């Protein structure tokens, strides 16, 4: 007869799984067994069908369990019945064709506009090379929404100061042109003036490391982390947070989702749509201004 203990012994002796992993499987399978026995006193593992498992998942969701928890427990049940099928305890696998609930992606973290205003205030920064370079990096991320790898790959020739455009080489070497404003233009010119005084100034690389060549991802991440900590309490303080901040600001000030997709260099619109949650503040303001009972 099929039992949880036989499966757990298989995990220990044949798959060499850790005791903690074995206990996690035991806990998940016991939860299903308890549910099934409440439905039928004559419950056996061999009598389980797909509908019973599907109803169990719905029961867990109704009880407030997260999709990640439901999917983990379903995964345990799937492995249990794969074992049972191979060992001929059952003739068919009732969990095989079942899919768990979709897991929601974590919402992007971003800085508020007043936090960015404070961070970019020129009085917050020194006038030496490292400070000017750091501020330029922050503004580049915030005004263009580019990725870390794209920023590191920039050359001086990628910047068109007359048209105020920057050529960005993204994933798959796909290039896109992104406009920028006077604040970034002035920051870049100030940075390039100081850069020209350095030994490696003839390099075509836009953002020079201290010893020449391109900056490393670690260097840029540290610069961003250190400076975001000055104005915000977000748990994550990374270049990608500034990319999220760019996207949020664009949407809140009226940019269309298709235009934002092109600026961010996304291949699919669905990737960009994760940012639409950030316009809630704008929708709330519209509601307050327009609804007669607001």
Language-model segment annotations:
Residues 1-294:
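Conserved catalytic core of the tyrosine transesterase superfamily
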């Amino acid at each position: 007869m099929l039992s949880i203990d036989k499966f757990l012994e298989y995990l220990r002796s044949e798959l060499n799984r850790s005791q903690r992993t074995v206990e996690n499987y035991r806990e998940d399978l016991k939860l299903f067994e308890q549910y099934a026995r409440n439905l039928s006193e004559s419950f056996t593992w061999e009598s389980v069908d797909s509908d019973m498992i599907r109803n169990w998942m719905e029961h867990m969701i109704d009880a407030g369990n997260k999709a990640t928890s439901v999917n983990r427990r379903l995964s345990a049940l799937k492995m249990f019945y794969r074992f049972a099928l191979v060992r001929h305890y059952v003739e068919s696998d009732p969990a095989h064709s079942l899919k768990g609930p979709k897991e929601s992606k974590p919402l992007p973290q971003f800085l508020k506009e007043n936090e960015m205003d404070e961070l970019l205030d020129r009085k917050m920064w020194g006038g030496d090379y490292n400070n000017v370079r750091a501020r330029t990096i922050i503004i580049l991320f915030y005004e263009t929404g580019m990725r870390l790898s794209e920023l590191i790959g920039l050359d001086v020739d990628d910047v068109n100061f007359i048209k105020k455009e920057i050529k960005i080489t993204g994933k798959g070497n796909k290039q896109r042109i992104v406009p920028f404003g006077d604040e970034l233009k002035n920051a870049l010119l100030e940075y390039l003036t100081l850069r020209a005084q350095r030994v490696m100034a003839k390099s075509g690389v836009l953002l020079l490391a201290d010893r020449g060549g391109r900056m490393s991802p670690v260097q840029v991440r540290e610069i961003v982390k250190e400076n975001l900590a000055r104005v915000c309490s977000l748990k994550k303080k990374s270049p990608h947070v500034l990319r999220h901040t760019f996207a949020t600001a664009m949407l809140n000030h009226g940019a269309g989702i298709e235009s934002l997709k092109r600026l961010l260099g996304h291949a699919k619109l669905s990737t960009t749509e994760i940012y639409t949650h950030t316009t809630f503040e704008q929708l709330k303001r519209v509601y307050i201004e327009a609804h007669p009972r607001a």
